[in-house]
Amino acid sequence: MSFSLRFYTPPDFTQPFLADAPDVCFQPTPFDGVAPEQYHAMSIFPEYFKVNGTWLLAEESRMDCVAVYENGKIIVREFRLLKKGDLIAIGRTEDGSQGIYVHANGFSEERELQEVFAFRQGRSRETAFSKDYNELYEILRHDRDHGKIVWVLGPAFTFDKDARDAFSKMIAGGYVHALMAGNALATHDLEGAYLNTALGQNIYTQKNQPNGHYNHLDTINRVRFHGSIPAFLEKEHIDNGIIYNCEKYHVPYVLAGSIRDDGPLPPVFGNVYEAQNAMRDQIRSATTVICMATMLHTIATGNMTPSYRVMADGTVRQIYFYCVDISEFAVNKLADRGSLSARGIVTNVQDFICTTAKALGL
């Protein structure tokens, strides 16, 4: 199939309701981390703010954050990062009447007439996904060279040899530009490389190994002994796996900790807000985001990913967002964000990544 990005059509600012709209009002924050009353909360869509008669687009957006006017630009900032005196956009309307316009239909898309009552409107095990797979393959081929592909992984990948190998090939093939996960993904991947097990089970035969329940703890302990993951890989002569290939091909990875973690591994963020900052740093330039088998990290990533990206040349393009999970709830939770770019695929993620790697010729 022939793939092309959806064309973005900006608002027509000559329309009377936009041309005659007032400038947006800004008010300073009274204290660090506190927005003024009637602050405007951002959505996932392109949003424009009228300043001195000119409509400015918020270039790096994030839902449920506020718009700050700074150095002639609209900067989207989390509440916790606000500083006293920051100028915050005020207004709860989105139709331009307060100098704020949310442009929800900027990307061209063929829309068919939909009936009020129809079967299978959500995504389930009965949904046909062939078209979704083919579109995803084309997106990955495009963004390998013309975008940034960010993957968000749960530990399920590390429990299967073929899935682990397939994702390693994806990294080597240039289809992974950043990886976000938790302590478990990295721990069990390194366990697989070090001891050929995940949670004490052989990653191919799935047979429990003697005292295998120690294996992930031994792996963490050994990494901590060496002081870092790169040192562990070198000293223990590790030559396979997801984390190994991230290091080999200089793919950045963010490991966000949780309250149930063992260890953790040295690079894991123990502070949730530092982890969130590091994740958003990767999302700021992402053009395709694929989340698999981790509801917590998927929802967190979805909340910080807008539906669009402003590229270096000033063009606005769509961000493609996929949620792949065997749980229908997890998939439909992301679809409920209301984004035309959020797509769900209900399947076993181990099979999914193997199928995807083969389709890409890896």
Each predicted region: which residue ranges?
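Glycine-rich phosphate/diphosphate-binding loops that line cofactor/substrate pockets in enzymes
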Residues: 134-149, 170, 245-246, 281-286
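Gly-rich Lys/Arg/Thr-decorated short loops/hinges at beta-loop-alpha junctions or inter-strand turns
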Residues: 109-124, 221-225
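Gly/Ser/Thr-rich loops at beta-strand to alpha-helix junctions
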Residues: 94-95, 153-161, 184-187, 261-262, ...
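Long terminal accessory regions outside catalytic cores
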Residues: 1-83
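C-terminal functional extensions of proteins
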Residues: 203, 209-251, 261-289, 294-362
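Metabolite-binding pocket within alpha/beta catalytic cores that recognizes anionic/polar moieties
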Residues: 31, 139-141, 145-228, 346, ...
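Loop/turn positions that initiate beta-strands
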Residues: 83-91
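Short acidic, glycine/serine/threonine-rich loops at helix termini
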Residues: 100-104, 161-166, 189-195, 265-268, ...
